[in-house]
């Protein structure tokens, strides 16, 4: 009698699980995997994963990692790792189509040296020193998404993040003790062109 009850409970649990999986697969697209082409053009492999919360909100996480040059003694470095958490509100009531706006929280760890660029006032110290540190920021953005069919889409967006960075400055490309520590606040622009696949 006890084993029969256990078998019945197991069958009910399996049926409920199958029904749940079938229900999720029958609903509209729930997830999107994407790639930011602007970030890729900067030679930073990246990937995003986004999920539908309801008919007008999605929640996502994006990450990028630029490990090269892998040689710690290389003179020029532009290595970084980033994570961006974001939420998007879709104004037409259907995720991944039409106008949207959103909010994000950003974290970046970087290791830079011998760079001749000044990205909106940032990284000026990296021209003659190696700097290593973190950026933390929050911001907002807006954009438009096009449905290309067969689950594929493309969206463009622009916005800004208010970011705080703390970094250590070194005299050589691979040294021990820092010569200075600095904190800065920046307003960073955010531009992306994302290609995504929804499922």
Mark where each language-model region is.
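Bacterial N-terminal signal peptides that target proteins for export
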Residues: 2-14
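Residue-level preference for beta-strand/loop junctions
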Residues: 13, 29, 41, 79, ...
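Cleavable N-terminal signal peptides
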Residues: 15-16, 26
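Sec/Tat signal peptide C-region and signal peptidase I cleavage site
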Residues: 22-28
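Transmembrane beta-strand segments that form the barrel wall of outer-membrane beta-barrel proteins
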Residues: 29-42, 58-69
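Short, surface-exposed coil-to-beta transition loops
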Residues: 43-46, 139
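Gram-negative (and chloroplast) outer-membrane scaffold detector with strong preference
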Residues: 51-156, 192-197
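Predominantly the C-terminal beta-signal and adjacent terminal strand-loop region
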Residues: 149-199
């Amino acid at each position: 009698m006890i084993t029969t009850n256990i078998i019945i409970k197991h069958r009910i649990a399996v049926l409920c699980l199958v029904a749940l999986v079938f229900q999720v697969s029958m609903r509209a697209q729930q997830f999107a995997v994407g790639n930011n082409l602007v970030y890729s053009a900067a030679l930073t492999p990246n990937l995003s994963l986004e999920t539908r919360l309801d008919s007008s909100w999605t929640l996502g996480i994006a990450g990028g990692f630029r490990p090269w040059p892998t040689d710690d003694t290389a003179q020029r470095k532009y290595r970084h790792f980033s994570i961006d958490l974001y939420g998007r509100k879709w104004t037409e009531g259907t995720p991944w189509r039409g106008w949207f706006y959103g909010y994000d929280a950003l974290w970046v760890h970087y290791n830079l040296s011998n760079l001749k660029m000044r990205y909106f006032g940032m990284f000026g110290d990296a021209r003659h020193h190696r700097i290593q540190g973190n950026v933390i920021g929050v911001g907002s953005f807006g954009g438009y998404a096009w449905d290309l069919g067969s689950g594929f889409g493309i969206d463009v967006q622009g916005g800004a993040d208010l970011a705080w960075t703390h970094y250590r400055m070194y005299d050589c490309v691979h040294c021990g003790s820092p010569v200075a520590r600095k904190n800065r606040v920046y307003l960073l622009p955010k531009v992306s062109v994302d290609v995504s696949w929804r499922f």
